């Protein structure tokens, strides 16, 4: 069992057969050890690393991208090679995503569900930018609350500087440094309930969905986080769905399941981008090394047209990406086609 502020090291074959030195430097014997990768690779140092430490969990480096069937095969390969009973098994998802974030999310959820069905607590490991670009992590939290292990190094000087904490909902563990090895800190006690902070039950009637807390009260005219996901409840206590909300001069979008949208969201035929807090972004957005422009008036993404920004004119491709060329200091005359 680990408690808040406990430390641990995650190791793989990269750390070699003898990990006693790094455990001494870290001042702990707690480890999470890599077992497998894809459906063929096994860590050759696993047995030695287990013998020298106190494993609190094991991890699998995923290669399944957005393929649910492959995720099932990888999960089974992982489970078949767990060497001892532990509480946590980790999905390391940081490479080879598909271009479809929902497909990636579905594959991750299937992998984690197989872990849960086998009697373990599933954990999702990755980096914040990678996760935001490739996975809807709120869906993961809705199914597995407080299940995130997120890497964010800041200055990467070997210390846990919370000025650089990768703020996200549902983080259980933080990998705060890779210098000179992977260092981690526990943020939630093992015994802390994995269920939502506000315990209760969703209810539905002819007017919509509402949430009844265990004490009999219900949220209204407010945001409420339930199962790691933000929802907004109107003056009568009903959850807003498929609807825009203006709150403190910022616009938010509540998806068809009521969850607050983050990242890219398609509303009707228009694309919008919501920041980590859920607020709609206007102006320039950089995403996966490409630039997009969201109108200041409505926030929708511009595509297949010129926009004026500052002193320049820019052309946005049909997919919304900024064209490499041309940029203009004055509005172009006539029709210009950009391949």
From Swiss-Prot:
Outcome recorded upon mutating residue 92 to A: Almost complete loss of activity
Which keywords describe this protein according to UniProt?
Antimicrobial, Bacteriolytic enzyme, Glycosidase, Hydrolase, Repeat
**Which EC number(s) does the record attach to this protein?**
3.2.1.17
Where in this chain does the record put each Ch-type lysozyme domain?
5-206
Keyword flag Hydrolase: yes
Record Pfam families: Choline_bind_1, Choline_bind_3, Glyco_hydro_25
The active site lies at 10, 92, 94
- Cystine pairings recorded for this chain: none
Top-level EC class? hydrolase
Enumerate the Gene Ontology biological process terms: cell wall macromolecule catabolic process; defense response to bacterium; peptidoglycan catabolic process; viral release from host cell by cytolysis
**Cell wall-binding repeat locations:** 200-219, 220-239, 241-260, 261-280, 281-300, 303-322
- Gene Ontology terms, MF aspect: lysozyme activity
According to UniProt, the reaction catalysed is: Hydrolysis of (1->4)-beta-linkages between N-acetylmuramic acid and N-acetyl-D-glucosamine residues in a peptidoglycan and between N-acetyl-D-glucosamine residues in chitodextrins
Give the protein's biological function. Answer: Responsible for the separation of the host daughter cells at the end of cell division and participates in the liberation of progeny bacteriophage into the medium. Strictly depends on the presence of choline-containing cell walls for activity.
Domain comment from the record reads as follows: The C-terminal domain comprising the repeats is involved in choline binding.
Q: What is this protein identified as?
A: Lysozyme
| Protein source organism | Streptococcus phage Cp-1 (Bacteriophage Cp-1)
């Amino acid at each position: 069992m680990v408690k808040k502020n406990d430390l641990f090291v995650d190791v793989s074959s990269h750390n070699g057969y003898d990990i006693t030195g790094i455990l001494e430097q870290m001042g702990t014997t707690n480890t999470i050890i890599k077992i497998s990768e894809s459906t063929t690779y096994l860590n050759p140092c696993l047995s030695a690393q287990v013998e020298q430490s106190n494993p609190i969990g094991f991890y699998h480096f995923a290669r399944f991208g957005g393929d649910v069937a492959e995720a099932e095969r990888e999960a089974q390969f992982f489970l078949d090679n767990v060497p001892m009973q532990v509480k946590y098994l980790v999905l390391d998802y940081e490479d080879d995503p598909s271009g479809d974030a929902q497909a990636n999310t579905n594959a991750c959820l299937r992998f984690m569900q197989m872990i849960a069905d086998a009697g373990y607590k599933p954990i999702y490991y990755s980096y914040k930018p990678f996760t935001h670009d490739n996975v809807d992590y709120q869906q993961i939290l809705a199914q597995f609350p407080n299940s995130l292990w997120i890497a964010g190094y800041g200055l990467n000087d070997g210390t846990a500087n919370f000025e650089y904490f990768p703020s996200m909902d549902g983080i259980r563990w933080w990998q705060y440094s890779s210098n000179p090895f992977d260092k981690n800190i526990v943020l939630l006690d093992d015994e802390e309930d994995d269920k939502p902070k506000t315990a209760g039950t969703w209810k539905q009637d002819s007017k919509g969905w509402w949430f009844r807390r265990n004490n009999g009260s219900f949220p209204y005219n407010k945001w409420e986080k339930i199962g790691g996901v933000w929802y907004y409840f109107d003056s009568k206590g009903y959850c807003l769905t498929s609807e825009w909300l203006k709150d403190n001069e910022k616009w938010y979008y509540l998806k068809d399941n009521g969850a607050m949208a983050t990242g890219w969201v398609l509303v009707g035929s228009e694309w919008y981008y919501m920041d980590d807090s859920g607020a709609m972004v206007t102006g320039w957005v950089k995403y996966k090394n490409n630039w997009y422009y969201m109108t200041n008036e409505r926030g929708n993404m511009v595509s297949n047209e010129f926009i004026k920004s500052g002193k320049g004119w820019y052309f946005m491709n049909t997919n919304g990406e900024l064209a490499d060329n041309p940029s203009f200091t004055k509005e172009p005359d006539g029709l210009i086609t950009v391949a």
